[in-house]
Amino acid sequence: AQTMMNLHGVRPGKRILMLGSGNVGLVVSFQLLQCGCEVAALVDAAPRIGGYGVHAAKVARTGVPFYLSHTIVKAEGEDHVTGVTIAQVDEKFQFIPGTEKHFDVDTICLAVGLSPMSQLLKMAGCRMEDNPKKGGQVPVCDSYGETSVPGIFAAGDVSGIEEASSAMIEGRIAGAAAACRLGFITKEELEEASSAYRASLSQLRQGMFAPENRGKLLEKTEEGVDISMNLLRKGYLLDEEVEKYPGVTRRKGIHPVIECSQNIPCNPCQDACAKGCIQVGKKITSLPVVDGEHPCIGCGMCVASCSGQAIFLLNEDYDETSATVTLPWEFLPAPEKGAKGTALGRNGEPVCEAEVLEVKTAKAFDQTRLLTMRIPKEYAMKARFFRAAESGVGA
């Protein structure tokens, strides 16, 4: 589905059920919504969402329901899908009678069971190993990514399933080693480059989703804050638990609210803020903190830079009765100034009426628009998405 959309400009279907709640399932679900598809449900047999909470939250706030501890019982159709039935499973992954749910869909997307693409290396005679931590059969490599066959290097999904950032750094290490082997750089230059890359790779492999934490249910962040169980099971933070995270602030004037609640390797918000208002610190997995000594100027760079769409600009005192919420907008067509609609909460349910005050674009925003909506003041900490009077995601 991702290839069809991104490379060929083809919509995979009209109404889709996504199986798998890892980062691939979450990100592709959002891309399907951007493509104009309707995502009927996001389903996973696991009891908890497997991907980053911020990616789940940006899907949930559009109204897509999550069904954890559920999987597919039956797909319907002859030459194409016409429907699907799912059911809840117990701790042994057996179907629980009476929990069946039916959806009329024309497409089922599978985002489960990822395994390393290592077949070519096996055919080339590289020594292989079965490594569950890396997702299955992978080549045995040294610290530079070189396999048992001299001159053949492996990185990314060939050597193990990880995030894209880790794959790119592994590729840089392997590329530097290959350049050294061919005489383009010295061993000293290789060591200098690979040392810096390994330091970055080590940081990316820390936090809640570190390899040693796979399969574990963590209850606290590194800062000692309770991890939201509702986020893990339903895809969104509860209104009453949001303010316990250090990026969520209440103050006069425009200010950022950062609903990042998990220790993940991410810090573009810190880099984007020229005023030093947002701090992550030296450890890339730390929760972002809003520094009150550096006032926000409302530029919106942090909102546009967050790939998890977890940052909002609030003005809780826009006027006597209203507040404004500025949120990232990546759907077409974008609402026009003055458009009336409904503000949705974190769970995708309507919370109040809303009016678009501004839709801002800039080259620095990298094609992300900033939509500012006016809402009743009492909903400032609840309204997180805009749906125009017409039906559809943001339409």
Give the residues covered by each predicted segment.
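Short, well-ordered loop/turn sites that connect or cap secondary structure elements
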Residues: 334-336
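Short, surface-exposed secondary-structure boundary micro-motifs
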Residues: 179, 346-348
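Short beta-strand-centered aromatic/proline hotspots
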Residues: 349-363
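Iron-sulfur cluster-binding cysteine motifs and their immediate structural context
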Residues: 267-285, 301-317, 346
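Short, solvent-exposed secondary-structure boundary/capping segments
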Residues: 361-375
